[in-house]
Amino acid sequence: MPTISEFFGIMILMFFDDHAPPHFHARYGGDEIVIQINPIGVLRGKFPPRALSLVIEWAQKYQQNLMEEWTRAANNKKLHKIPPLD
């Protein structure tokens, strides 16, 4: 499961050939959450409120990139890094 971005201690990961709907995983400390890409929203898991708001902000900024990486992952192609939240 490649890490496609990391910021403020939050790791953003995407699995190869993962189930629909298009989504990514985020880890922070001992917490993990799964975020749908379009529309952006929590599929499952729990995150501290501040960390969740940062992940949502990042996902909104890079939604197109996330969909491109989801397509690459679904086709077992090498994933590209997405810039962190600044």
Q: What kind of feature is each model-predicted range?
A:
Residues 1-86:
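Basic nucleic-acid-binding interfaces
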